[in-house]
UniProtKB/Swiss-Prot annotation:
The protein, known as: Protein KES1
Lineage per the UniProt record: Eukaryota, Fungi, Dikarya, Basidiomycota, Ustilaginomycotina
Keyword Transport in annotation: yes
InterPro entries: OSBP_sf (IPR037239), Oxysterol-bd (IPR000648), Oxysterol-bd_CS (IPR018494)
Biased composition (Basic and acidic residues): 317-339
Entry's family note: Belongs to the OSBP family.
């Protein structure tokens, strides 16, 4: 593959800049998230919006608490989780042509939304906050109070370059709480995050592949192990996975397929059938409902980035770059002023835990690593 092949999916007028960006990546030491990407590869969406992907199948989220026993509930948790992956990792290729670099949220940036009650499923609400800027960390809280299902977590990324691929280690976890109908009991599920590979850089058409393993561990001692593989040079299908639900080292159910396509039970299913459909990723996703920008607070994401996002969408990259620089310079000055006054930034919607005990207890059940991790919990709010 020669130099002439670099960025063949990139507009001709942008190819020189793309080639320079690739060289910058290859020689950069440290976390790539701090690099400034060429304008045409920027997304008009802030990273603080990404937790919304967890909620884009609100029916599946609400159904989790309807399982008749812990085994059925774990199957429902896995189904909801697999259902979130297409939105999280491939849907932007359809909507924007290829994976784009999201806007790096400012400290304290908020994203608030909801999925309305339909068919008596209950309303699902979302609160996300950028709780750290160096390194960038987003905390989120998703809740369907009627269904008794709540998800809380945080996510950060550590990125590096290898060959022609960006490797992304997702840092963080989520805790899913399920209140059991007719009792005061609740089940917890620790959800760890898969690592990512961003491929297709050479051609200027990046896409995401999942790699390695992730886990879902419940307080009922059930463990789901997910293994991800992608398309190799000679074999394999893109976006493939295998999930095994087990207890005490014994496999109970196995699901295989493509997380961006169709997956099926391998052998028996939870309903007693054989090789049944598990999930079809063409199932319609529901976008989160958000207040109009004019009604949003000054720290809400789409208000913060309104001019930048409009510039990116309209191809006016000069305006987008200028306003992005204005925002970032104002943030740097704000941090300096806070340091000088001895008044550090305070989280608005979340509390930071130096050691998330629920994570530690659940991770110990499957010898998960790291053994300890910090966490975030939503502050109680007065309505």
């Amino acid at each position: 593959m020669g130099e002439e092949d670099i960025g063949e999916a990139v507009p001709k007028e942008q190819r020189q800049g793309w080639g320079q960006f690739l060289k910058q990546i290859a020689t950069f030491s440290g976390d790539l998230s701090s690099l400034t990407a060429p304008s045409f590869i920027l997304s008009p969406v802030s990273l603080v919006e990404f937790p919304a992907y967890w909620g884009e199948h609100p029916d599946e989220f609400a159904k989790i608490s309807t399982g008749k026993d812990e085994i059925e509930r774990m199957n429902l948790v896995l189904k909801w989780f697999i259902g979130t992956l297409k939105g999280q990792f491939t849907a932007r290729n359809t909507s924007m042509g290829s994976e784009k670099k999201p806007l790096n949220p400012i400290l304290g940036e908020l994203f608030l939304g909801k999925w309305p009650d339909k068919n008596d499923r209950g309303e699902t609400t979302l609160t996300a906050e950028q709780v750290s800027h160096h390194p960038p960390v987003t905390a989120y809280h998703i809740e369907n109070r009627k269904a008794g299902v709540t998800l809380e977590g945080h996510c950060a990324q550590k990125t590096s370059f290898s060959g022609r691929t960006i490797q992304v280690k997702q840092v963080g976890h989520a805790i899913l709480r399920v209140k059991l109908a007719g009792s005061d009991k609740e089940e917890l599920y620790l959800i760890t995050l898969p690592n990512l590979l961003i491929e297709g850089l050479w051609y200027g058409a990046p896409y995401v592949e999942l790699t390695g393993n992730s886990y879902i561990q419940s307080t009922t001692c059930l463990l789901t192990t997910l293994s991800y593989t992608g398309k190799g040079y000679f074999s394999g299908k893109a976006h493939s996975f295998k999930a095994t639900i087990g207890a005490g080292g014994n496999a109970l159910y196995t699901v295989e397929g493509e997380w961006a396509g169709v997956s099926k039970y391998k052998g028996k299913s939870v309903s007693g059938g054989s090789n049944e459909l598990f999930w079809d990723a063409s199932t319609q996703r529901e976008e989160v409902s958000v207040e109009a920008v004019e009604q949003q607070g000054e720290m809400e994401s789409r208000k913060v980035w309104k001019t930048v996002a409009h510039g990116i969408r309209s191809g006016d990259f000069e305006t987008a770059s200028k306003d992005k620089a204005r925002i970032e310079n104002a943030q740097r000055q704000k941090r300096k002023d806070e340091a000088a006054a001895g008044t550090p930034h305070q989280l608005e919607r979340f509390v930071h835990l130096d050691n998330d005990q629920e994570y530690s207890q659940l991770a110990a059940m499957f010898k998960g690593q790291p053994a300890t991790e910090d966490g975030y919990r939503s502050k109680p709010r007065v309505h």
